[in-house]
């Protein structure tokens, strides 16, 4: 059996279509995976795109002809038990034959099983794809390994199943070669500190083995623990101002690019080093928002993360130029009394969220991705996340502005907001696909870059401060003549690629191809 993986931000919107043969379940409600009726595809890489993939697979807003799964039938979502799917997940659905590209495939199978590995981030969608080597995915075809958590509703929610997972244990993992990968930035960026453990830096020779396709502009943002956000509001607007604790865009505090670089390169070790007039941020904070220590905590991503790679590109020039300073590295068990920033390296976006939230509350959830040892009270922490995260404000962290600009589709399309990159899909040209898998992968990539699909997936990224998420790239789609974002068909007028050169996120973005009448907004 082979592997089917949906791009971390692409899977969800692709569901829907004509009814097909029902998926068979056992007495415990666990699907029985039948190789004769199920295409299997394995996708590894970007964890930041995870919510996008969920939406791609479930949204009924996506036109029927563009869906991958049949949303008229129940969809099953598998998650690794320990992290609740932050590291590993898989989706089982009826294949949507109302999509012309998926009708009449060889093998005549009715169902689709897509495995998605988030653990290790974007580089796991690059380095193993180049090497065409097996990495661990979730094992879902052993009923004793899995338990149903909740029942879903067709077209609305998944039936959720948890499966025990242990990397390196073939009884509790599924080693497979990724059919394709997804990365927040283009593959060449995975060198130096961006190289994942166990793999070599990406070279020009490596790139020649791949087909790489830019699919979407993905917006990132600086995330801070909620009490830190509130303290920043106190320092910005005054402790008694109505903006303190508010989620409105006019109440979002801001950090400048140079301040962000100073923090993430480890130049600051205490929140007292962020000055407020003749005082400082820590001393200025009210008792309810002040942490028990002024030590600066950073939730960063592990080497190989695309989220971390884009942070380096946008704020430190790393690895784009030889004199760039790379981000500060994990400090491990360093005592908090040492005058050095505490750096916590997280393997996925879900783990990043946990790091920020648990430091904010001074608590720890045993057995999950982040082991918080700072349990005497709250700490202020800062991190980086894709803007499709936490739109429902369910985690104890918040986005802030960068250089005074909020991270919205509108501000990106106007050329005002800087922290966005173009994510790519890639597959190895020599990879051996099972029957019809290549056609499914091609359609998955195509629909991931479809602005009509993005309009549907972006509904999960509506924040109190504006619409965030993804925009289609201008290489395959036309931006509006005015340069304003069309939320029903969002296309970025800017690109890190040119009409003569492929996407490279180290390139300063510019308008792609305005023709004789197109343009960009002045304000």
Name these PLM-found stretches.
Residues 1-21:
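Gram-negative bacterial Sec-dependent N-terminal signal peptides
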Residues 22-523:
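Flexible loop/hinge segments at secondary-structure junctions
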